[in-house]
Curated annotation (Swiss-Prot):
Residues 70-100 are annotated as: Putative zinc finger 1. The keyword ATP-binding does not apply. Plants silencing LOL2 display a dwarf phenotype, decreased content of gibberellin GA1, reduced expression of KS1 involved in gibberellin biosynthesis and reduced resistance to bacterial blight. Plants overexpressing LOL2 show constitutive expression of PR1 and enhanced resistance to bacterial blight. The gene is LOL5. One of its GO terms (biological process) is positive regulation of growth. This is Protein LOL5.
């Protein structure tokens, strides 16, 4: 088996230069040096499939157009900012994981001593003011009513209550 001259041997592993390289000696023809996939005559006649596919914009980033909420850390009382919809907020000062309450889970009452507006989770019996440390009892007027009590009962024409 004859060897190719050094000038015709590939010195790089580039696929394009390897397939396009032709031997310099006239009598040697190597089939492995030919292009692997010649262009098809039907490839130019068929329409491009990408043109027929409707382009859909990528979904927005989960952090764009998000509302930012604020809460006070339950341990060190520092103000924390978080994206709305988060279940927990991590305080970087004291490493506490704070549970985030939604608006419908929070009650509001004024402090019985300094009249500061206080927020508390529904069901709490009392709230301690962070300014004057006074404990305000959550009375019956501040307890969230049940849904069945909030909805008035309707009566039909025969005098029976409807659900």
């Amino acid at each position: 088996m004859s060897q190719l001259p050094l000038a015709s041997q590939a010195t790089t592993t580039d696929l394009v230069s390897t397939t396009a390289m032709q031997p310099q000696s006239e009598g040697i023809v190597d089939e492995s040096l030919q292009p692997q996939h010649p262009p098809s005559s039907t490839a130019h006649d068929s329409p491009c499939l990408q043109d027929s596919v409707p382009l859909v914009p990528p979904p927005p980033s989960p952090y764009l157009n998000k509302e930012v909420g604020q809460m006070v850390c339950g341990s060190c009382r520092i103000l924390l900012a978080y994206f709305r919809g988060a279940g927990y907020v991590h305080c970087t000062c004291c490493q506490t994981m704070n549970y985030v309450l939604e608006a419908h889970e929070v009650g509001k009452v004024h402090c019985g001593h300094c009249a500061t507006l206080l927020m508390y989770p529904f069901g709490a019996p009392a709230v301690k003011c962070s300014l004057c440390l006074f404990v305000t009892e959550i009375g019956e007027r501040n307890v969230r009513r049940r849904l069945s009590i909030e909805q008035p009962t309707r009566t039909n024409s025969s005098g029976l209550a409807e659900a």
